[in-house]
Every structure is written in structure tokens, then in C-alpha cells.
């Protein structure tokens, strides 16, 4: 008895169901089963040694991965009913329409729902069907997949692992695979890509991969962009986005997975339209370090296709290999040779050893196939302008070495883990920036860092994280230290003047993190040169007159003149402020900062000298005053300070002169309290020579509730709340992204730097300046306490 389609949950909306019924209307030869399909056993199709958990780079997760790709609940039930399973490389609509030519009296969908209709693309997945063989009452289950040689082998290998593990019944012997070669060969035509690609204009930049996620990001980053064309077909979608006259991004999404060499077929079809470039933003695995998972962008320039343990195509052998337009700007993104292989199941430790011997650093299933397809197109059409290939790859797993199989690796190939989602969002945001920069839609700044302490430890990695090219590094007396840092990070100009680096490398962003008494001269030099956005560490200068002069000189400038006050960009403190709801709700703010910074020092340094701008007041006080102003949306004045005291607990320290010592003439600790706004009281307790590391901010609200941020070194950030007469409890907040681990000063600077770079790239300096702390704000903040500590 035939099954009623309406009795089972459909996986498509009604309009989409009708489209699928009309698909693949090809005439059939009555001898179809003999001429247009062929059946083989799994082992024939897989044709590589079946891996085990003992020799696969996924180790214990191999079985879990394979079973997660199959409808195991239904396959187990089918096994109990002794219903055999076949793998068919054809979509359901094809088999249903032509079921008699395929040898079945009827074919219907089973209840397994595999289609995620919340996703606009890449949602079509293998389906489980039931069919009755012609001329008998024998029922068979058909696992149907989209055709494509590599995709077929991939699913065949998954089934083989599952059957060998006992998860799928072996009652009927090896699983039979039925192939439809004509569907594979004509796939670009019957899926509609050939027709859809006619809407692509020569010179377009094509975006593949995470297109639905990137479209709103492109539109947000380029507010003047406009959609000039949109198509939605059965298997694809196209949006043409004009960034500026003459520059169009064509974002093409596929509703199925163009796995392995299908990716090459897609790219070859699109290359016929003569686009300027094809950008592929997707995920891959790494052979380099598990620390790269979810964190590091890979953008290869060299490619190799591997199959059955052999390199069957190597891009190094071809002069027509596509160029990566980003490689010259960000050479560190090119980690080495990229390898593509038909199936993840093939990636056992022997495979890893073989590809590593070829110099491989990363692996996926289709990127090298795309590079191969473009290379073939270039070689077949030597007179055509070559199509560029820009891959931006998100690392989701690490291929372990034989000795590492016991290692726990935080991979998540399904990308359903919450942490993966958060890091994927960061990757997509950065990828959107990088694609726009690669085609000169936006331009990242080129930076000079002055200072090899905080400058190299904190500023440099934060800028590199955002893709900023650091073109100059200036240090102090220890030139060898500066050269070593510069060489390590590929910085071209070492201890070269600002004017020269600006002239030779186009430097336009300056970070001043030198010794305190050198800040003023550097800021003045940059202001006189012009053309620099400036971010200065505290202090801006050692006297109020110079600070006010810089503030006045910066008035009306379209460029940024900022102090490094990053706490207002720190997500935990942003959440603390949000939890207070309104600044007027805050009755009191208590800030405590304890650090071993000074007590760890065993020799005299400029930090202990008033003449050199040392002491905790100049180093830290404005951080806390700035935080108070931000929390209360108010400005402090000298009258805001009711009481202030300083102290020094550091004794004489040895100097460079043998036997000589010096006693600090600045404070190692300070306390201050007062009022701000209409009625908010504040207190600050800062000790630079404490025996612990602690930073806390406590808010007392007008409803008698208390909120607290607290961070101890080596411990996670705590956000807490306390009701009257109760214990401290965790504050429930919604994090848009995982808070990075590390010092609040380093991490808050990373967030500050990210927004800074985006503001410069997108021409939104004014809005960012309103959010940050400028020279004039800083001069006013120092004026709150300056006269009390001898800063005139």
C-alpha cells in the first residue's frame, strides 16, 4: 500500500514543496535502471582503509560525528524490522517523480526531518525515504543525498563507520549505493546555477560561504550600499549589493552543501561570468595548533587536492593559480599549504602524516577544489583576466598527531556549541572588514607604537587582532630589545622618526606608551606633523599648562586625540552600568584597586621619580575618575574631591650605580572620596604595592540594592548583586559574546582598540570621540586632583 505524503511532516513550505515537485523534469529511457544508474557496495565507493577511534585524528569523536549525520533512531527501527537501507545519490523529488524508472512502485518521505528552514542557505540535508521495489512487496529505506562524487564518498564512509560500529544493522550485508552519473555531470544546470549566474556581471566580486551572515554586515559597514538585484531560486539565492558605482558584490548562497569537488564545479560555472574575484568565507581544520580553533583566521595562497592517500593535484605545479588579494596586506594570515580531501572520515593519522610531509597547515573538503577549478579556467583561457580567490577560513577543529590522540580538542564541527557561535560572530565581523579592505572599500590605519613595554605586550597584539599594520616601533635605550620585537612581528621601521615613517609607509595612527616624561614631546611632534590619530597613555604631560595647550591645539580637529581610558569599553563594566538602569539611581560608587605592580620591582626605575612622572596618582587616578564620570554621566571638578591622601610603602631601592640606593619621592598608594552629579558619593582606594591583585567596583542604588564587579588575578570575572540583608548572588546578564580572559586593563584595551579601528575605517571618528576620553577631558580630570599633588 502506497504511503500518503500528507500523513508525514513535510520539510518545505507549501510553495517550496511545489517547486520541488516540478524539478528535474527530464525524459527517461525505459532502460533507465541499466543505463542511468549503477549500484555499488560501500567498500567499493569508499576505497580507503576504514579508520577506527584508535587511528583517526578525531579519535573518540569519530563515531559521534558519523552518527550525528544519520537518522539513527529511524535506522535502528528499520534494522529491527529487517528493512534494508540503500544510499541513493539523487534528491527525493527526482526519485519520486521517476520511481518506476528507478525500479520502485512508490517512493515517499519518511518522518525524519533534516531541513532547517531557519537557515536561508545550506539547509538541504540527506533525507530518509521508504520505497517498494517493483514487482514485489519488498520495502527498502533510501537515504538520499545530493549528487557529487566527493559528497557521495563522504556519506558512504559515514555509513560504513556506523555499520562497522554496529549502529546500523548488518542483517542484509553491505549497504548498497546507487549512483546517478548523469545527475552529477549536469548538476549545475538542473539545480539552476547556470541560469542564475547569468545575473552576475563581469567584474563583480562574488561572495560564497557565509553569505546570509555577511550581507547585513556589509550593509552596516557601508551605509551607502544598496541592493540592486535579488533572486531566489530552488537551490540558490543571489543578492547583488552595490558598494559604490562600479563595485558590486554578488552574494550567492546554495541551499545544499557543495561539498568537495562540487565546490569546484560551482566556482567553474561562476568563473564563466568573468568576475573580478571569488571570496569564500567558511570553516576548516588546522594541522598547526589547537589554540587556533575559533580564534585564528587562515587565508591560504597555496593549494593541494588529496585523494586516496595521494596528492592528485598541486597548485605549485601551475603558474595560473589564482591570486589572493589579501595576502600582500596580511601575510600572517597565510599559514601555509592548504589541502582538500573528499571526506573527513579519511583524515586518519596516516593521512595527517602524509599531508604534513607535503607541508600542509590546514585542511577542508572544497577550497583547494575551487582553486583547482579557477586554475583550469585560467589555463583554458590564457587571454582572460585572471579571477582572484580570497578565502577567509574559520578554524573549527585540529587534526591530532598519533601521539596526541588522547588530547582533548575543543572542536565542534556542527557549530552548535554556544562558544563556537560567539567566536563565529567575531570571525564574521572581522571577515566583513577584511573583504571590504581587500577591495579598497575601507582602509585600515597604519600604526606607530612608541614603547616596548605595554606597547608590545598589549597594544601590538590588540592592533594585530584587528588587522592593523604596525609599520613603526620605537623603544628606549635598549635598541636590541626593540629590534627583537620588531623583527618578531615583521615591523619594517625600528626607532625611525615619526615624520619618516609617515612619509615612507603612510603611518597615520600613533600610540604613545613611552616613559611618562617622554609623552609630551611625542604628542607635540605628532600634532605638528598632522595626519595622525593619536592615542596617548597617561599622563598626557607632567604639567597642566602643557595638557591644556594640547587640548586647545586639538580643538576642531577631525582626527582623534584620545587618552587610553579603556574601562568604559569593558563588557563586565558595561553590564554593571546597564544593571543600574539610570545614573540617577546610583547613590554611591566604591572602587578598590590593589596590585603588586610596584612591590614586584627590585631596582630603582623612573616610576619612583616625581620628576619622571612616576607615582600611582598620575598612573591610575584618572582611570577611576573617568570610570566614575562614565557611570554617572557627569563631569568632576576640583570641588568634587572632599578628601584625598597619599602614602608610600616602598623603601630605598638599588640603582645602576653599585652600592647606591634611592628612596621613591612619589606615592605608592592613594585614597580619595567625594561627590559627583547630584547626589552620588564615591570612594577610591588604590595601592600599587599590595600583596594581592584585585579590582572591584561596587554600586549602591537608591532602592538599597547593591551591584558589584570583582576580578582577581587568575580568577573569572564576577558580577554580583545583593538585596538588603542578603548574601551576594550572581547577577544575571546576557552576554552578546564571551568575555575574553586576562587583565582588565589588557582586555578592555582590546575592546577599545577594536572600536577605535572600526571608527577610523568607517569614518565615524566623531561618534567614537564622543564615547572615548579626549585630551580636554583628561586635562580636566587631572585638574580635579592635580594641585593637591603638586601638578600645576
Curated annotation (Swiss-Prot):
Gene inactivation effect: Impairs the production of cordycepin.
Biotechnology (record note): Cordycepin has antitumor, antibacterial, antifungal, antivirus, and immune regulation properties; thus, cordycepin has important value in commerce, medicine, and scientific research.
Keyword Plastid set for record: no
Subcellular location: Lipid droplet
Xref: InterPro entries: Gfo/Idh/MocA-like_OxRdtase_N (IPR000683), Gfo/Idh/MocA_Oxidoreductase (IPR052515), NAD(P)-bd_dom_sf (IPR036291)
A Gene Ontology term for the protein's cellular component: lipid droplet
Entry keyword Oxidoreductase: yes
Pathway: Secondary metabolite biosynthesis
Misc: Cordycepin and pentostatin biosynthesis coupling is an important point of metabolic regulation where pentostatin safeguards cordycepin from deamination by inhibiting adenosine deaminase (ADA) activity. ADA is not inhibited until cordycepin reaches self-toxic levels, at which point ADA derepression occurs allowing for detoxification of cordycepin to 3'-deoxyinosine (3'-dI).
Protein name: Oxidoreductase cns1
Organism: Cordyceps militaris (strain CM01)
Amino acid at each position: 500500500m502506497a504511503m500518503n505524503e500528507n500523513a508525514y511532516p513535510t520539510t518545505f513550505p507549501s510553495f517550496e514543496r511545489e517547486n520541488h515537485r516540478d524539478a528535474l523534469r527530464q525524459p527517461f529511457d525505459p532502460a533507465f535502471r541499466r543505463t542511468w544508474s549503477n549500484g555499488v557496495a560501500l567498500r567499493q565507493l569508499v576505497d580507503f582503509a576504514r579508520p577506527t577511534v584508535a587511528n583517526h585524528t578525531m579519535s573518540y569523536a569519530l563515531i559521534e560525528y558519523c552518527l550525528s549525520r544519520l537518522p539513527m533512531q529511524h535506522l535502528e527501527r528499520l534494522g529491527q524490522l529487517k528493512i534494508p537501507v540503500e544510499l541513493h545519490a539523487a534528491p527525493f523529488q527526482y526519485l519520486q517523480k521517476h520511481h518506476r524508472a528507478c525500479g520502485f512502485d512508490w517512493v515517499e518521505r519518511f518522518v525524519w526531518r533534516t531541513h532547517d528552514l531557519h537557515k536561508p542557505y545550506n539547509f538541504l540535508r540527506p533525507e530518509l525515504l521508504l520505497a517498494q521495489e517493483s514487482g514485489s512487496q519488498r520495502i527498502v529505506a533510501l537515504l538520499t543525498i545530493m549528487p557529487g562524487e566527493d559528497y557521495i564518498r563522504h556519506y558512504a564512509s559515514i555509513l560504513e563507520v556506523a555499520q562497522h560500529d554496529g549502529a546500523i544493522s548488518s542483517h542484509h550485508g553491505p549497504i548498497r549505493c546507487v549512483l546517478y552519473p548523469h545527475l552529477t555531470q549536469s548538476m549545475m544546470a538542473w539545480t539552476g546555477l547556470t541560469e542564475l549566474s547569468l545575473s552576475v556581471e563581469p567584474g563583480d566580486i562574488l561572495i560564497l560561504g557565509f553569505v546570509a551572515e555577511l550581507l547585513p554586515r556589509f550593509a552596516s559597514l557601508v551605509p551607502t550600499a544598496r541592493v540592486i538585484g535579488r533572486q531566489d531560486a530552488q537551490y540558490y539565492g543571489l543578492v547583488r549589493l552595490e558598494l559604490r558605482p562600479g563595485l558590486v558584490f554578488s552574494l550567492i548562497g546554495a541551499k545544499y552543501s557543495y561539498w568537495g569537488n562540487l565546490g569546484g564545479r560551482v566556482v567553474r560555472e561562476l568563473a564563466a561570468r568573468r568576475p573580478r574575484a571569488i571570496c569564500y568565507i567558511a570553516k576548516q581544520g588546522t594541522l598547526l595548533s589547537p589554540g587556533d580553533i575559533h580564534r585564528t583566521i587562515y587565508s591560504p595562497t597555496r593549494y593541494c587536492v588529496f585523494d586516496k592517500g595521494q596528492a592528485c593535484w598541486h597548485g605549485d605545479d601551475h603558474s595560473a593559480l589564482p591570486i589572493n588579494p589579501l595576502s600582500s596586506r596580511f601575510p600572517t594570515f597565510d599559514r601555509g599549504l592548504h589541502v582538500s580531501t573528499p571526506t573527513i572520515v579519511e583524515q586518519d593519522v596516516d593521512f595527517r602524516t602524509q599531508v604534513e610531509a607535503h607541508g600542509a597547515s590546514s585542511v577542508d573538503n572544497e577550497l583547494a577544489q575551487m582553486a583547482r577549478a579557477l586554475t583550469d579556467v585560467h589555463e583554458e583561457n590564457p587571454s582572460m583576466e585572471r579571477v582572484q580567490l580570497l578565502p577567509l577560513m574559520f578554524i573549527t577543529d585540529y587534526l591530532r598527531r598519533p601521539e596526541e590522540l588522547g588530547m582533548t580538542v575543543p572542536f565542534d564541527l556542527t557549530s552548535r556549541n554556544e562558544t563556537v557561535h560567539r567566536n563565529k560572530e567575531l570571525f564574521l565581523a572581522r571577515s566583513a572588514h577584511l573583504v571590504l579592505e581587500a577591495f579598497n572599500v575601507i582602509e585600515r590605519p597604519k600604526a606607530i607604537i612608541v614603547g616596548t613595554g605595554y606597547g608590545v605586550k598589549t597594544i601590538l597584539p590588540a592592533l594585530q587582532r584587528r588587522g592593523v599594520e604596525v609599520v613603526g616601533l620605537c623603544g628606549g635605550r635598549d635598541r636590541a630589545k626593540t629590534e627583537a620585537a620588531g623583527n618578531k612581528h615583521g615591523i619594517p621601521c625600528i626607532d625611525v622618526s615619526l615624520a619618516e615613517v609617515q612619509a615612507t609607509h603612510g603611518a597615520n595612527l600613533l600610540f604613545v606608551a613611552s616613559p611618562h616624561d617622554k609623552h609630551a614631546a611625542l604628542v607635540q611632534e605628532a600634532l605638528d606633523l598632522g595626519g595622525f590619530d593619536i592615542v596617548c597613555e597617561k599622563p598626557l604631560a607632567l604639567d597642566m599648562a602643557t595638557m591644556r595647550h594640547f587640548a586647545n591645539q586639538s580643538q576642531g580637529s577631525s582626527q582623534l586625540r584620545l587618552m587610553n581610558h579603556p574601562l568604559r569599553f569593558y563588557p563586565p563594566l558595561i553590564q554593571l552600568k546597564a544593571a543600574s538602569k539610570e545614573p540617577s539611581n546610583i547613590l554611591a560608587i566604591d572602587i578598590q584597586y590593589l596590585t603588586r605592580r610596584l612591590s614586584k620591582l627590585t631596582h630603582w626605575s623612573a616610576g619612583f621619580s616625581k620628576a619622571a612622572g612616576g607615582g600611582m596618582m598620575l598612573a591610575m587616578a584618572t582611570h577611576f575618575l573617568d570610570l566614575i564620570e562614565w557611570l554617572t554621566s557627569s563631569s568632576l571638578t576640583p570641588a568634587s574631591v572632599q578628601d584625598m591622601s597619599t602614602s608610600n610603602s616602598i623603601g630605598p631601592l638599588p640603582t645602576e650605580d653599585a652600592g647606591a640606593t634611592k628612596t621613591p619621592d612619589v606615592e605608592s598608594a592613594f585614597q580619595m572620596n567625594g561627590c559627583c552629579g547630584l547626589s552620588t558619593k564615591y570612594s577610591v582606594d588604590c595601592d600599587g604595592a599590595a600583596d594581592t591583585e584585585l579590582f572591584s567596583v561596587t554600586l549602591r542604588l537608591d532602592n538599597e540594592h547593591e551591584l558589584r564587579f570583582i576580578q582577581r588575578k587568575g580568577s573569572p570575572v564576577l558580577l554580583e548583586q545583593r538585596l538588603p540583608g542578603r548574601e551576594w548572588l550572581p547577577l544575571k546578564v546576557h552576554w552578546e559574546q564571551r568575555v575574553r580572559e586576562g587583565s582588565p586593563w589588557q582586555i578592555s584595551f582590546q575592546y577599545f582598540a577594536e572600536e577605535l579601528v572600526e571608527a577610523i575605517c568607517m569614518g565615524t571618528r566623531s561618534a567614537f570621540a564622543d564615547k572615548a576620553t579626549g585630551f580636554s577631558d583628561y586635562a580636566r580630570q587631572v585638574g580635579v586632583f592635580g594641585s593637591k599633588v603638586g601638578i600645576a
